[in-house]
Amino acid sequence: MAHSKQPSHFQSLMLLQWPLSYLAIFWILQPLFVYLLFTSLWPLPVLYFAWLFLDWKTPERGGRRSAWVRNWCVWTHIRDYFPITILKTKDLSPEHNYLMGVHPHGLLTFGAFCNFCTEATGFSKTFPGITPHLATLSWFFKIPFVREYLMAKGVCSVSQPAINYLLSHGTGNLVGIVVGGVGEALQSVPNTTTLILQKRKGFVRTALQHGAHLVPTFTFGETEVYDQVLFHKDSRMYKFQSCFRRIFGFYCCVFYGQSFCQGSTGLLPYSRPIVTVVGEPLPLPQIEKPSQEMVDKYHALYMDALHKLFDQHKTHYGCSETQKLFFL
C-alpha cells in the first residue's frame, strides 16, 4: 500500500468543499428558491425556472464552460492534498477530435476531475488548443443549479446526443468517458487493477462514426485513496447496493479513509499521489455505420494500447513489476 502523508487542515477543508458545495445546492439553495416563491421575491425563482426551460438542451449542445470557475484557487489546494498530476506521452493535435477512455473509475474519480475539469494541473498548457469535456451521468443535468455548476467546469452529459455534438462541431474537442462506469466503483480496492472494459464497446463505435481518435488514459493511485468494504453477492448489503444503483444510477459504496487527526479513520481520502498518464492517440477512420467486426477490431487495438500504457508506467507510480492489468 502506498505511503499516506497527513495533509494540512486547510487542504482538508478545501477538499471537503467539493462534496459540500453540492450538498449546499441540494439542501440550502434549492429549498430557498422554493421558499422565495411564497414571498415578495417570487419573480427570482420564476425567472430562473423560465430560463431553465429555455436552456434545457444546453448540456447536450456543448455546455457552457467558465474559465473563471476552472481556475479557482480551491482546485489547486485539492491538487496538493494528494497531490494530483498529469503526464503527457504524446501531443494532441488541435486539428482532430478525441474520445478519451478514463480508467479506472475509482470511487470519486479525483484524478479525472482535477485534471480535466479544472486547470489546477495545467491542462491547457500541457495540451494547447484542446478543450476537455468529462462526461458524467445525464440525470445530474436535470437538477437545478447543479447543472450550471457542472457545465461551468466543462462537464458534459454522457448521453449520445451530447457526445455526438462535441465530436461533430469544430475540432480540438476531447471527450472523456469513464468507460467502466459506476460498476467499476466496486472494483476500487487498493492494490488492484481490474477494469470493466471487455464488453464496453459503444465508445469505440461512436469514435468510428465521427472519425475521432481514441486516447487511452490510466490514473495510477486512483484506487489507493480509500479502503472499501466489499460484500458477498448473496448478502443483503450487496442486494441493497444493486437496488440503489437501479434507482439512482450509481452504487452506494461503503468506504473509509483518514480523518483530520493523524492515524485515525474518517471519510477523507488518504493523501497518496494520483498520476493520470495520457497515452498516444489511436487514429480511427470515419465510418458512418461501422460493422461489428470493425468495432471489435479497434476495441482490441484500444485494449492493447491501454495495456501497454499501464505496463510502461506501472513501476514508476507505485505498482510492482509483476502487477497485471485485468479486464472484465
UniProtKB/Swiss-Prot annotation:
Record bears the keyword Disulfide bond: no
UniProt keyword list: Acyltransferase, Endoplasmic reticulum, Lipid biosynthesis, Lipid metabolism, Membrane, Transferase, Transmembrane, Transmembrane helix
CDD domains in the cross-refs: LPLAT_MGAT-like (cd07987)
S-S bridge residues: none
Gene Ontology biological-process entries: arachidonate metabolic process; lipid metabolic process; wax biosynthetic process
Primary localization: endoplasmic reticulum
Residue spans crossing the bilayer: 12-32, 34-53
Keyword Transmembrane: yes
Catalytic activity: a long chain fatty alcohol + a fatty acyl-CoA = a wax ester + CoA; 1,2-di-(9Z-octadecenoyl)-sn-glycerol + (9Z)-octadecenoyl-CoA = 1,2,3-tri-(9Z-octadecenoyl)-glycerol + CoA; hexadecan-1-ol + (9Z)-octadecenoyl-CoA = hexadecanyl (9Z)-octadecenoate + CoA; decan-1-ol + (9Z)-octadecenoyl-CoA = 1-O-decyl-(9Z)-octadecenoate + CoA
GO CC terms: endoplasmic reticulum membrane
Leader peptide range in chain numbering: none
EC number: 2.3.1.75
Compartments in which it is found: Endoplasmic reticulum membrane
Highest taxon of the lineage: Eukaryota
Entry-linked InterPro entries: DAGAT
Record function comment: Acyltransferase that catalyzes the formation of ester bonds between fatty alcohols and fatty acyl-CoAs to form wax monoesters. Shows a strong preference for decyl alcohol (C10), with less activity towards C16 and C18 alcohols. Shows a strong preference for saturated acyl-CoAs.
Family note: Belongs to the diacylglycerol acyltransferase family.
Name of this protein: Acyl-CoA wax alcohol acyltransferase 1
Organism in which the protein naturally occurs: Homo sapiens
